Regions:
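Tight coil/turn sites that cap or link beta-strands
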Residues: 20, 69, 83-85
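Noncatalytic modules at the cell exterior or secretory-pathway interfaces
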Residues: 34-36, 79-94
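Short, surface-exposed beta-strand/strand-loop-strand elements in extracellular ectodomains
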Residues: 42-62, 98-100
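Exposed aromatic-hydrophobic patches
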Residues: 71-79
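Short proline/glycine- and polar residue-rich coil/turn motifs
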Residues: 64-70
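C-terminal interaction-tip segments
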Residues: 2-30, 41, 91-110
Length: 110
């Protein structure tokens, strides 16, 4: 089973949401990214997501910005394949980001 940020494992049968307020490797295993929810403390707070384990070697998937003090859900038209894991780089003025993802085993079975 794919790993989780806390070192546990996640069954490959459902989407999950991982919240964070700091830079974080969401998973080291292949996965699909379904969307993000950005909670910013100021307009323009930003979060950048990568296919990989860090910002330096990962493939940038996109930078997502939010308005202040509201939930900013960002859905993707279709899941994005992340073959090298998912890394989130929390930028300025972010209270929390919720990363919606699922292990690749589930994605392949759908």
């Amino acid at each position: 089973m794919p790993d989780t940020p806390d070192g546990g494992s996640l069954p490959a049968d459902r989407w999950t949401c991982t919240p964070t307020a700091v830079d974080l490797v969401i998973t080291r295993a292949p996965a699909e990214l379904g969307g993000v929810v950005v909670l910013a403390s100021a307009d323009g707070g930003d979060v950048t997501l990568y296919d990989g384990l860090d910002a330096g070697s990962g493939r940038k998937l996109g930078t997502f910005k939010g308005a202040a003090n509201v939930s900013n859900p960002i859905g993707l038209p279709k899941p994005v394949y992340c073959g090298r894991g998912i890394y989130v780089d929390v930028g300025a003025s972010i209270t929390e980001v919720d990363v919606i993802w699922r292990p690749l085993a589930q994605a392949a079975e759908s």
